[in-house]
Curated annotation (Swiss-Prot):
Gene name as annotated: rplU
GO molecular function, one term: structural constituent of ribosome
Listed GO CC annotations: cytoplasm; ribonucleoprotein complex; ribosome
One Pfam family this sequence matches: Ribosomal_L21p
GO biological process terms held by the UniProt record: translation
Record keywords: Ribonucleoprotein, Ribosomal protein, RNA-binding, rRNA-binding
Role noted for this protein: This protein binds to 23S rRNA in the presence of protein L20.
Keyword Ribosomal protein: yes
Quaternary assembly: Part of the 50S ribosomal subunit. Contacts protein L20.
Name of protein: Large ribosomal subunit protein bL21
Organism, as annotated: Clostridium botulinum (strain Eklund 17B / Type B)
Keyword Ribonucleoprotein: yes
Family: Belongs to the bacterial ribosomal protein bL21 family.
PROSITE patterns tied to this protein: RIBOSOMAL_L21 (PS01169)
Amino acid sequence: MYAVLATGGKQYRVQEGDVIYVEKLDAEVDSTVELTEVLAVANDEGIKVGAPVVEGAKVTAKVLAQGKQKKVIVFKYKAKKDYRRKNGHRQPYTKLVIEKIEA
């Protein structure tokens, strides 16, 4: 059984036991979160696709960690004009383990 869920502007195909990294969620470490924006659910009987979400479906996940990704360097310059700007950015993330898929 798997589900396709949306969170943080991205879509994830998950099964029970999967570990995923999503955009930062406002949750404490070791707490559980319910993700209700489930776009599709598939099991032995077939696939159920929502319009836009599957009614009554939810995915329960446990928060393993909160952190920041590796630094991305943004470097802008204009040739021959002595214009240089260097910026760094670290995107926050939440590490989840999928515990249960309900459809």
